[in-house]
């Protein structure tokens, strides 16, 4: 079932899980809790977009792990490069910087994390996503739509508030 409804929930679920991953990774490395997201809420939209793109484009390759992995490396790297570049150009800030990593491209992407994202996306497509999609499918459609409205509204409000706040800071 590839529907807007399903992909909206996939986006929100993986945006939240990505935020959890980022916060935990940072906390383990620094001993500090820091909201690692672009937004104020507990979401990292790049993870949600990444999984939606990978699932849409690479599910047909699910049985060929090598092609799935290579496609995942390529798609997630292109997404991270594009988003990192766009965020810096639009808001004059970097949310990540791989400049000190070997084999980096402008500090936006690097080989180590491209390979990590490739492994992660491969595991998501093969192991995690089928369970998440089944979980979304268990929720009665009407209840899911009713719940999606305030979740989407909160996300959009957070996005607008964040963008306006950054724009205001950049004017100062």
Question: How should these model regions be labeled?
Answer:
Residues 1-172:
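Aromatic-rich, lipid-facing transmembrane alpha helices and their immediate juxtamembrane interface loops
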């Amino acid at each position: 079932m590839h529907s807007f409804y399903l992909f909206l929930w996939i986006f929100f679920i993986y945006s939240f899980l990505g935020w959890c991953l980022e916060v935990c990774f940072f906390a383990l490395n620094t001993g500090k809790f820091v909201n690692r997201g672009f937004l104020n809420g507990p979401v990292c939209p790049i993870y949600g977009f990444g999984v939606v793109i990978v699932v849409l484009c690479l599910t047909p390759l699910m049985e060929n792990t090598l092609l799935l992995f290579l496609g995942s490396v390529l798609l997630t790297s292109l997404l991270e490069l594009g988003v990192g570049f766009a965020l810096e150009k639009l808001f004059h800030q970097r949310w990540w910087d791989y400049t000190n990593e070997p084999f980096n491209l402008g500090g936006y992407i690097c080989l180590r994390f491209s390979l990590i994202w490739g492994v992660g996306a491969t595991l998501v497509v093969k192991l995690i996503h089928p369970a998440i999609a089944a979980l979304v499918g268990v929720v009665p459609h009407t209840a899911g739509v009713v719940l999606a409205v305030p979740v989407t509204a909160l996300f959009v409000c957070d996005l607008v508030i964040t963008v306006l706040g950054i724009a205001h800071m950049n004017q100062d």
